[in-house]
Amino acid sequence: TRRSSDLSIWTARVMVTDAQQKVYVLDGNVPILVQRTTMEETLDVEARSHVEMFHHFFFTLAPDDKYIRYTMDKAMYLVDETGLAQYNTLKEKGFYNNIMGTSAVFSIFCDSINFNEEKMEFTYYGRQRIERRTSILTRELVTAGKLKRVPRTDNNPHGLLIVDWRTLLNKDIEQKNKNNF
């Protein structure tokens, strides 16, 4: 019986370990088995998503001071003091007041993100569209930085922090006048 109780304990342990590897998600009332993954297995996807999310919050701007504060608050959870320094520099230069004064709307479009998993470094390539009353300006934007692992939170769902963030290129590529009737 000692042998059968050892076998029972071993079998139970295997079943519990197996059950812990299974995750179910409810679709309505139907449970669906999903594959559990580790951060290492999804790092490339999560890193790119994190970088794109930060750029969306930092560079999508509307002529609304509450909206700007909201998006900057969100962006600051995703970046270290290098992002805060850029924000403060722009604020001191009156950049955000100018947006409100001219009713400019800024949108960002990601072209690609190169991510080196080994070095945890990224380069972001995108275009920014700046729509003003009389014109639309398109700018080319290239930024770079590194990623550092941090605990996941509601404000930082990927558990990554952008560090040493800098702008490598931010230049005008096209200016169009609007036809105002």
Describe the residue ranges of each PLM region.
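Amphipathic alpha-helical dimerization/oligomerization modules
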Residues: 128-130, 134-181
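Core segments of small alpha/beta cavity-forming domains
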Residues: 39-106
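Surface-exposed, charged secondary-structure patches
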Residues: 102-136
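Soluble periplasmic/extracytoplasmic beta-strand elements of cell-envelope proteins
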Residues: 24-25, 34, 109, 123-125, ...
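N-terminal/domain-start segments enriched in small and hydrophobic, helix-friendly residues
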Residues: 15, 39-41, 45-47, 156, ...
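Short, small-residue-biased leader/transition segments that mark boundaries at the very start
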Residues: 1-4
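Short extracytoplasmic/periplasmic juxtamembrane "stem" segments immediately C-terminal to an N-terminal membrane anchor
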Residues: 20-40
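Aromatic-capped interface at the extracytoplasmic side
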Residues: 7-26
